[in-house]
């Protein structure tokens, strides 16, 4: 839109709103309004004819192309499986030569149909689609003229309202007289333009309707006979379709059922057609007697591995944690008949204790009394008097290694996806690494973990210990 057109549209805006809401004096011409409605009907009819003709030609061409593609698909299905057989002696010819021949024959018939109907499609485009397109161009030009007439009506009503308002003003100043003269001039000019376009359209639109009617009616009639000719060609070609593979004398459903035989039953009898894959389900405690058994098999291997790891502590754990000071850590196990079970495990696996026992004789180190202090405090606080007296007579053994830092948090890896089923549950996906907050030795129970800042409980048999 040009600047001039924009300013005109802006000046017409108040009058446009008054016209829409029927406020003030609005010019109405019943004869023109009736002609305008007939013109809109003509425009709709012409568009529909052009669209229907175009859709029809596209549908016929698409139908034939689809039939060719269908024949190609049947040929590919009937062909034997390509590739070299692993055992040439057991190779069987699985192709359907008769079916391939029938599909090829049907394909040739469709190709012949395309050639015969190509001329009919060209006739439809030449006599229906193209003339209708020319009519639509004329209709668009006339529509622009109708729009211009409506704009002239808005200008006419606008200038008339302004002129009438200034004319009814009683005490007019020199400035008002000047405005009145300008408004009268604009009103006369807009009145002449409106009358010109309004009278021209009222006179020429009926002539256009008569010409369009004499133009569109033969198009509809010709389009009908063109479709009839297309259907006749299709019927003649397909009725003389002589393909021995098909039995045209019997019902199509009966022929299909006879050819299919018991293929469906044999296919459904195959085991591979009933194979289903699904992840193990887990029932929360207290939901039924079968909840525990349903997931025990999926986690048995992980439970056995975890129990073996618990029965054999690693050397790194034993060396990092020093033995309690209240136990005879530097004496041999053979001189004491009743050492504690925990001391025996630490003594056999701790390299620091064995080195100290080899350096200092057993007779020089009497067993110290059992002290109630914890192991970490016994290393750094003064010892009891008997121990101090014994230590004064012999060289002081090297200090025990400092207590190791707190063990790292335990983590598990998710084996399956789990969605929270109740408030307090922790959702995760397969492969997520979850920090364990609290757990039991039974993987069929619910553990507590933390993932991405969220803490909650989850089934133990859905995860694997790292």
Swiss-Prot record:
Key word Transport present: no
Domain BAR: 17-269
Biased composition (Low complexity): 294-303
Top-level taxon: Eukaryota
GO cellular component: actin cortical patch; actin cytoskeleton; mating projection tip; medial cortex; mitotic actomyosin contractile ring; Rvs161p-Rvs167p complex
Segments forming domain SH3: 407-466
Positions where Phosphoserine occurs in the chain: 298-299, 301, 303
GO MF annotation terms: protein-membrane adaptor activity
Gene3D superfamilies for the chain: Arfaptin homology (AH) domain/BAR domain, SH3 Domains
SMART domains according to UniProt: BAR (SM00721), SH3 (SM00326)
Record-level GO BP terms: actin cortical patch localization; endocytosis; establishment or maintenance of cell polarity; plasma membrane tubulation
Keyword DNA-binding attached: no
Region listing for Disordered, in residue ranges: 280-342
Record key words, sorted: Coiled coil, Phosphoprotein, SH3 domain
Pfam families noted in UniProt: BAR (PF03114), SH3_1 (PF00018)
Residues in coiled coil: 31-67, 177-204
Function: Has a role in DNA damage signaling as a part of stress response processes.
Matching PANTHER family: BRIDGING INTEGRATOR 3, REDUCED VIABILITY UPON STARVATION PROTEIN 167
Protein name in UniProt: Protein hob1
Gene: hob1
């Amino acid at each position: 839109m040009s600047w001039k057109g924009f300013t005109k549209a802006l000046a017409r805006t108040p009058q446009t709103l008054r016209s829409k809401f029927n406020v003030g004096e609005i010019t109405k011409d019943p004869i023109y309004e009736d002609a305008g409605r007939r013109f809109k009907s003509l425009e709709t009819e012409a568009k529909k004819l052009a669209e229907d003709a175009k859709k029809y030609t596209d549908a016929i061409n698409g139908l034939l192309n689809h039939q060719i593609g269908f024949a190609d698909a049947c040929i590919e299905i009937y062909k034997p499986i390509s590739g070299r057989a692993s055992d040439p002696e057991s190779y069987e010819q699985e192709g359907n030569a008769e079916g391939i021949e029938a599909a090829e024959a049907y394909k040739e018939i469709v190709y012949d149909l395309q050639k015969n109907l190509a001329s009919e499609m060209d006739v439809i485009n030449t006599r229906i689609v193209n003339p209708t397109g020319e009519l639509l161009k004329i209709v668009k030009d006339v529509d622009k003229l109708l729009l211009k007439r409506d704009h002239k009506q808005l200008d006419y009503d606008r200038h008339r309202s302004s002129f009438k308002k200034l004319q009814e003003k009683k005490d007019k100043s020199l400035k008002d007289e000047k405005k009145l003269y300008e408004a009268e001039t604009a009103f006369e000019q807009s009145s002449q333009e409106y009358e010109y376009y309004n009278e021209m359209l009222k006179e020429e639109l009926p002539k256009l309707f008569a010409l369009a009617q004499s133009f569109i009616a033969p198009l509809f009639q010709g389009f009908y006979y063109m479709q009839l000719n297309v259907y006749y060609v299709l019927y003649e070609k397909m009725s003389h379709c002589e393909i021995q593979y098909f039995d045209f004398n019997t019902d199509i459903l009966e022929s299909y059922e006879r050819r299919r035989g018991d293929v469906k039953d044999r296919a459904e009898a195959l085991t591979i057609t009933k194979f289903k894959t699904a992840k193990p389900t887990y029932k929360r405690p207290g939901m039924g007697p079968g909840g525990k058994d349903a997931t025990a098999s999926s986690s048995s291997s992980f439970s056995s591995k975890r129990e073996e790891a618990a029965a054999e502590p690693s050397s790194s754990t034993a060396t990092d944690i020093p033995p309690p000071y209240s136990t005879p850590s530097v004496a041999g196990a053979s001189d004491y008949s009743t050492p504690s079970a925990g001391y025996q495990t630490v003594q056999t696996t701790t390299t620091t204790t064995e080195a100290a026992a080899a350096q200092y004789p057993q007779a020089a180190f009497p067993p110290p009394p059992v002290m109630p202090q914890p192991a970490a405090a016994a290393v750094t606080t003064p010892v009891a008097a008997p121990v101090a007296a014994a230590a004064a007579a012999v060289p002081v053994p090297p200090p025990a290694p400092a207590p190791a830092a707190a063990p790292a948090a335990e983590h598990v890896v998710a084996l399956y996806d789990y969605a929270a089923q109740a408030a307090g549950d922790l959702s995760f996906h397969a492969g997520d690494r979850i920090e364990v907050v609290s757990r039991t030795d039974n993987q069929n129970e619910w553990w507590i973990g933390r993932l991405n800042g969220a803490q909650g409980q989850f089934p133990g048999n859905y995860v694997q210990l790292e």
